[in-house]
Amino acid sequence: MGKKYTVTYKVAPQGSQYVYQADKNEHKAGDVHSSFGGHMWYVLNDGDGNKESFGFESKHDQMLGEGQITPFDDVAYQQTSYETTVELTEFQYNRLKAFSEDPSLVGFDETRYNVAKNSCVDFVFASLKAIG
């Protein structure tokens, strides 16, 4: 029997508590704030129990500006309103892993954040395109 690769998509509702895992702008690791608009991200499982979280955020906590991939969402967000796990083939897992490391593979611009058209929601949607 082969490995069971999975991806779990997660949604944190507006107002969810977020605990900073590293210093970011004026926030220090351990600071807590409420999510202004909610958030989406996903967690990859390699079939051996190793999990990696991938999300997309504003680098400077602004609605427009620089963007960045973040590995902290799964531990930083203290509640979710929705989660769904999808089993992946090895090919799909490898495609999603490659996308997670280089989102431009499917045309996603990780350098620019725009809450209206290049946000965490768009990042998650692009991840779905990556796995077909």
What are these language model-derived features?
Residues 2-85:
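Glycine-rich catalytic cores of cysteine/serine-nucleophile enzymes that process amide/ester linkages
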Residues 72-132:
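Active-site nucleophile-His-acid catalytic modules used for acyl/amide transfer and hydrolysis
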